[in-house]
Design a protein with these regions (language model features):
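Active-site microenvironment for binding and transforming phosphate-containing groups
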Residues: 1-267
Length: 267
């Protein structure tokens, strides 16, 4: 079982960070902000419909991402949830049009992780400082949004448990990827919030005075859920210091686009 890795690539101007090994037959990628059609302050590959960008621009950007990943023809099956900074995990088990319509209605009511065990159904979640997590194994994948609320609620571990329950795989077999997010050294939080994280995960989450490492908390949640340490890989990119390549809510003053975490399987 090969260890996961994240490698940069580019297709028609769209920069992707993914695993060319396609673990379990899963195509996965974290997107950046370049290669799209959106105008400032959403320039240019904004994937979020909730930020004030032109809907047509977002639709074209999403098409470009799937095309760059080799799945443009799957655009009509794309599932994008309404992220609410919670810990709800939803599962997609049926890719028929009626079932997908029902799934879209379900995730529109709010969820922050989706497990998918059917082929040809891409899942996309959107980010701008919060941590993105993709899990992949034979038979399925999960994409999760892990901001501080989701992280302290162990959403990555919950998604791992749900994925394994659906696929019958062991947690240690799952490839785990943490995408670009605000790194601990850049993430200043209140003393109270830091204390809450230390109580939940231990001192490893402290990245400095009033600095919180979401990565270490996510790693702990995954390990506690049974993940193999060698199967967890981090992008090593902080959105706060890579604003030319990724969107950062904090650095932009709250007005910006959203990059994405995307995954799908093939028949």
């Amino acid at each position: 079982m090969a260890a996961p890795l994240l490698k940069s690539s580019e297709c028609e101007g769209v920069a992707l960070l993914g695993d060319p090994g396609r673990p379990g037959g899963v195509t996965l990628a974290f997107t950046g902000r370049r290669g799209g059609v959106s105008e400032a302050p959403f320039d240019s590959l904004n994937l979020g419909t909730h930020v004030g960008d032109e809907p047509a621009s977002v639709a074209e950007n999403r098409r470009r991402v799937l095309a760059a990943m080799g799945g443009e023809e799957l655009l009509g099956s794309l599932v994008v949830p309404n992220q609410v900074h919670g810990i709800e995990v939803r599962v997609i088990r049926d890719g028929s049009p009626a079932s997908l319509a029902s799934a879209r209605q379900d995730v529109a009511r709010g969820c922050d992780a989706i497990v998918c065990v059917v082929p040809d159904v891409p899942v996309m979640l959107c980010f701008a400082d919060c941590a993105s997590v993709i899990l992949a194994c034979e038979g399925g994948f999960a994409v999760a949004h892990s901001g501080w609320r989701g992280t302290i609620g162990r959403i990555a571990g919950k998604a791992l448990g749900a994925l394994c329950a659906e696929t019958g795989r062991e947690p240690g077999e799952v490839s785990c990827y943490v995408g670009p997010h605000i790194a601990g050294i850049d993430y200043e939080v209140s003393d109270d919030l830091l204390r809450r994280f230390v109580a939940e995960f231990g001192e490893r989450v402290v990245a400095g005075e009033r600095r919180l490492s979401l990565l270490e908390a996510i790693r702990s949640a995954l390990l506690d859920a049974g993940a193999d340490a060698s199967m967890i890989v981090d992008s090593g990119i902080s959105t706060a210091t890579a604003c030319d390549r990724y969107f950062s809510y904090r650095e932009s003053g709250g007005k910006c686009g959203r990059h994405g975490a995307v995954a799908f399987m093939r028949r």
